[in-house]
């Protein structure tokens, strides 16, 4: 792993992550029991040819998986967190309007702690207060890195624009669309880079980026939905990671909170992160 600052080494990075874990009073690493669930990032690093094939398959599936999870008018008084008086970065109605809380009809063991309830239609509802807190934690973590040493990756269609906007806002690097195998692991590849931390939109769609981050030993921050497994994720941000509006809100908040923790004035509005439907 390349150095974050001149004085930062691998031991200090581990200590930093431990402090964040203590702050939230929970472990970021999932127990081995979660291994019985299919985890696309838990396999051994594939050969480059196999990785190319897997990336092509993921790209072919993209239009279907990027459909908005629910085409409905938001219910702005929906029950989405245990404490109705929780202090949030934005009004809870704004989270609801963007559908940040809307999970899938599948739930993994590793995401169970972030789920508030299940709706009558079978959709799991994510705890928005935990989403809000994890955005703050991720921003605090990212603010410790040199901007150019942060990499954000998003293969999902609806995550590409807000991910690129996030990179522009905080000075990070972005790799959107297909993640080319070897980007982090092959020094002979023209697009080879050595970031110190990776942010991904979805551990499934961005599995190649996650695998390479694991190989080179750098931490992974991931937007995770109710159907994700998190065994290879260091810091989970629980959110609807498929919806256009939800991803715009999450990346916007993460950018502004990161800038705020650097002592910079956040200068971006939500509209700057939104794409046309």
From Swiss-Prot:
One GO cellular component, as annotated? small ribosomal subunit
Q: Which stretches does the entry tag as region Disordered?
A: 1-78
Task: Determine the domain of life of the protein's source.
Answer: Archaea
- This protein's record includes keyword DNA repair: no
* Biological process according to GO: translation
Task: Please verify whether the record's keywords include Ribosomal protein.
Answer: yes
Q: Which GO terms describe its molecular function?
A: structural constituent of ribosome
The family annotation for this protein states: Belongs to the universal ribosomal protein uS2 family.
Which PANTHER family does the entry mention?
Answer: 40S RIBOSOMAL PROTEIN SA
Name the record gives this protein: Small ribosomal subunit protein uS2
Q: Which organism is it from?
A: Natronomonas pharaonis (strain ATCC 35678 / DSM 2160 / CIP 103997 / JCM 8858 / NBRC 14720 / NCIMB 2260 / Gabara) (Halobacterium pharaonis)
């Amino acid at each position: 792993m390349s150095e974050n600052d001149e004085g930062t080494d691998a031991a200090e990075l581990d200590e930093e992550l431990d402090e964040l874990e203590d702050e939230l009073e929970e472990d970021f690493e999932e127990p081995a029991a979660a291994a019985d669930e299919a985890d696309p990032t838990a396999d051994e690093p594939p050969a480059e040819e196999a990785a190319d094939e897997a990336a092509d398959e993921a790209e072919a599936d993209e239009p279907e998986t990027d459909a908005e999870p629910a085409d409905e008018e938001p219910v702005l008084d929906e029950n989405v967190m245990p404490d109705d008086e929780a202090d949030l970065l934005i009004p809870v109605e704004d989270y609801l309007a963007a559908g940040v809380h809307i999970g899938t009809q599948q739930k993994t063991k590793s995401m169970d702690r972030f789920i508030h309830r299940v709706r009558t239609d079978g959709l799991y509802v994510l705890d928005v207060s935990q989403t809000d807190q994890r955005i703050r934690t991720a921003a605090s973590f990212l603010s410790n890195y040199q901007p150019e040493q942060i990499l954000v990756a998003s293969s999902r269609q609806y995550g590409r624009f807000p991910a690129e906007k996030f990179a522009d806002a905080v000075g990070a690097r972005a790799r959107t669309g297909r993640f080319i195998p070897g980007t982090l692991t092959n020094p002979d590849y023209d697009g080879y880079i050595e970031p110190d931390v990776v942010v991904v939109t979805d551990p499934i769609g961005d599995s190649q980026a996650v695998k390479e981050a694991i190989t080179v030993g750098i931490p992974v921050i991931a937007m995770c939905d109710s159907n994700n497994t998190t065994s290879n994720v260091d810091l989970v941000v629980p959110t609807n990671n498929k919806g256009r509006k939800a991803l715009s809100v999450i990346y916007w908040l993460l950018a502004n909170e990161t800038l705020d923790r650097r002592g910079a004035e956040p200068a971006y509005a939500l509209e700057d992160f939104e794409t046309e439907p």
